[in-house]
Amino acid sequence: MTVNLKNFLNPKVKMSKMGEFQELQPIEGLEISAVSADLYGDGRDDLALFYFREGANFAGVYTTSKVTSASINWNLKIRRNFVKALMVNTQNANTFTGIKGAQGLKEIAQALSKSLTLKSSQSPKGVSEVVKITDLLFASTGVIGEDFPHLKIKNRIPELVKKLKTEQNK
């Protein structure tokens, strides 16, 4: 594998800093997508979705800090160890955002639940399954204390779900 140092050091380059990467084999039952919600302001991907068609067992290890993000608080309320999807956003940690951050995350969860349920209903197998908001996990990383851009994220959910695929390479 080669790394193009000119691209690696140039923040304006939108292509991968790693250059060519080995082909990743599909993981059975997992679909992945990534899109830009323009959280960085430069068009690069900043949202990722991992969708487990049959569901997946999970365990979480979270911070012991008393300061937690809305995403961590959401995940801690999931009382079972089974999920259907994990959505990750960058650029905003959704921490110190108060009730607005929590409400924004709930709106995202409702929109994601609806889109994944619709995707499930269009399955070639003809099996329709409701994806509940309690089937969803969230992770946010980035700046602390800024308003959570939930509308930018929510508006990209249909495209994020549409782009789900088993091949992880773009």
Describe the residue ranges of each PLM region.
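Alpha/propeptide regions of enzymes that mature by internal proteolysis
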Residues: 2-119, 130-170
